[in-house]
């Protein structure tokens, strides 16, 4: 297991759609383990494979610090909202350091996918975990949370990014 480099805003891999996983092999298990290490090292609650430069439809999550929270991974994730109810809250991203903004997401979603052995998995999530599922699946579709912001919030976020030391290396 290893901590991998988190790709930052501006890297083309972050705006590329990840490929479906068809081979459930040792390299996939290693990727998942490395993603957990990377997420934990960075202090995140979720991480998509393209954030570590791998275009495979995999994400890991850990909301176990909250009551009823879970820790796990999902391969080839698909989600659907269970109601039209939404939540709005601060959202950030390991690939866009120092930027957080109010983002609206569905409150409750049903997630389905596969585990590292190819077995079906699924559950209903709400709150932070539902937000995480939507955020990480967006990543796998090549969509950054900045696209979910209203124009004024996006402009402010882009100003912070352009002024940041990490972006101007």
Curated annotation (Swiss-Prot):
It catalyses: N-terminal N-formyl-L-methionyl-[peptide] + H2O = N-terminal L-methionyl-[peptide] + formate. The keyword RNA-binding does not apply. It holds the Pfam family Pep_deformylase. CDD domains: Pep_deformylase. Belongs to the polypeptide deformylase family. It comes from the Bacteria. The active site is at residue 136. GO terms for molecular function: metal ion binding; peptide deformylase activity. SUPFAM superfamilies: Peptide deformylase. Its cofactor is Fe(2+). Removes the formyl group from the N-terminal Met of newly synthesized proteins. Requires at least a dipeptide for an efficient rate of reaction. N-terminal L-methionine is a prerequisite for activity but the enzyme has broad specificity at other positions. Transmembrane segments: none annotated. Binds 1 Fe(2+) ion. Its EC number is 3.5.1.88. This is Peptide deformylase 1. It comes from Corynebacterium glutamicum (strain ATCC 13032 / DSM 20300 / JCM 1318 / BCRC 11384 / CCUG 27702 / LMG 3730 / NBRC 12168 / NCIMB 10025 / NRRL B-2784 / 534). The keyword Protein biosynthesis applies. GO terms for biological process: co-translational protein modification; translation. Fe cation binds at residues 93, 135, 139. InterPro entries: Peptide_deformylase, Peptide_deformylase_sf. Keywords: Hydrolase, Iron, Metal-binding, Protein biosynthesis.
